[in-house]
């Protein structure tokens, strides 16, 4: 029993009479982009390691409903992978994509979930996982034998620290991947002393793991909160786990808000604004639908990010920019009060964290305006929660204005 994906044999997340299993995505970087040095404008040959190579021209046929003939698209393949974009107007033009999913597939991979579905113990489950390649998963496991485990499964490239963080020179052999991490070197744990395993897309290991991750795909707050909560339980019940799954407590707010409040200058705030500060000071970091504090916190933090990272955000409309993660803003508040990013370059003076945090607070209250005086304007209304159809285009099959 469990969840499946149309077209893929077997149950992806579920249980049988003996074991249960689930998964989340691994945050490992499995895609790199290489700038191709073409020999001439025909773009049929390119340079690599001081020698010329020919591209493979692959004609893709795209069938279109209602059309008598397919659309033909010629793709140039380098030894790295396809040159995805050709238009000079595209930021990724003339870049070859090396993506692990385009590697020659393992023919045994299609059998993994039927094998997991029939597994009776961890040994059989672990043997089935060895055939899995992409997309890499954090598999959690439990059995009637009392075993619990987590296996990180997938074909993960071996790369140097920071390799692939930015576009690589496609003419240099040193920039190629160094192979793939052997399956038996992928992180895994069976029956750990702490008596639980958990994954919420967070980083899987500490820094002692010998293979670089090279990418943090997710902020770690959710994973850290789940692990902290489980660690505090001595005899977890089904009810405890249900409460954890429906918890709206924010570890992010717990860590960020005290730093924001400690940097807030109250001197020029009127009585109404000081009342909002008191509301935030007494907040329990739970995003209850009837609460107002979650509105104040989220809007204040967003305004803080906008002012703090203005030198980066100014390029949003012109070039592709890596967005700064929330944890980095919290880290700036806690550990880097003298960092140059706190300064607004357009002003003659040098701003401090107190200046920026206070400016963001005032900006937040101005943005919310009259809504701050409306007793019915709560997190439920502000959040505007909706559940769209998976296609994102069939509105009658979605739920909107849930609040």
Where in the sequence are the language-model features?
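Mature extracytoplasmic enzyme cores
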Residues: 1-274, 278-290, 311-314, 398-400
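Acidic, low-complexity N-terminal propeptides/linkers enriched in Ser/Thr/Asp/Gly that mediate export
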Residues: 132, 144-148, 155-156, 197, ...
């Amino acid at each position: 029993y469990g969840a499946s994906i149309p077209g893929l044999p077997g149950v992806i997340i579920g249980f049988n009479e003996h074991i249960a299993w689930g998964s989340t995505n691994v945050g490992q970087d499995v895609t790199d982009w290489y700038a191709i040095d073409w020999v001439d404008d025909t773009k049929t040959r390119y340079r690599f390691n001081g020698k010329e190579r020919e591209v493979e021209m692959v004609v893709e046929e795209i069938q279109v409903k209602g059309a008598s003939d397919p659309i033909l698209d010629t793709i140039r393949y380098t030894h790295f992978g396809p040159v995805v974009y050709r238009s000079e107007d595209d930021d990724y033009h003339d870049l070859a994509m090396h993506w692990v999913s385009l590697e020659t597939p393992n023919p045994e991979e299609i059998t993994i979930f039927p094998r997991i579905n029939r597994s009776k113990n961890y040994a059989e489950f672990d043997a089935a996982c060895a055939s899995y390649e992409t997309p890499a998963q954090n598999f959690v496991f439990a059995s009637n034998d009392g075993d619990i485990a987590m296996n990180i499964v997938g074909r993960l490239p071996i790369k140097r620290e920071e390799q692939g963080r930015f576009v690589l020179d496609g003419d240099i052999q040193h920039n190629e991947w160094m192979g793939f991490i052997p399956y038996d070197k992928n992180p895994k744990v069976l029956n750990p002393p702490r008596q639980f395993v958990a994954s919420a897309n967070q980083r899987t290991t500490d820094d002692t793991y010998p293979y670089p991750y090279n990418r943090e795909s997710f902020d770690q707050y959710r994973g850290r909160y789940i692990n902290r909560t489980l660690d505090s339980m001595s005899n977890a019940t089904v009810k405890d786990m249900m409460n954890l799954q429906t918890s709206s407590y924010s570890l992010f707010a717990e860590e960020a808000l005290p730093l924001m409040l400690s940097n807030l200058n109250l001197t020029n705030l009127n009585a109404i604004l000081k009342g909002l500060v008191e509301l935030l000071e007494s907040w329990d970091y739970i995003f209850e639908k009837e609460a107002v504090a979650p509105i104040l916190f989220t809007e204040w933090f967003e305004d803080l990010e906008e002012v703090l990272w203005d030198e980066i955000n100014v390029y949003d409309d012109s070039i592709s920019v890596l967005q700064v993660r929330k944890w980095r803003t919290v880290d700036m508040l806690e550990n880097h009060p003298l960092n140059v990013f706190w300064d607004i370059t357009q002003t003659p003076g040098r701003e401090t964290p107190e200046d920026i945090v206070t400016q963001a607070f005032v900006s937040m209250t101005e943005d919310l305006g009259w809504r701050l005086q409306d007793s019915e304007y709560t997190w439920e209304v502000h959040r505007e929660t909706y559940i769209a159809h998976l296609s994102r285009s069939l509105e009658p099959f979605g739920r909107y204005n849930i609040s």
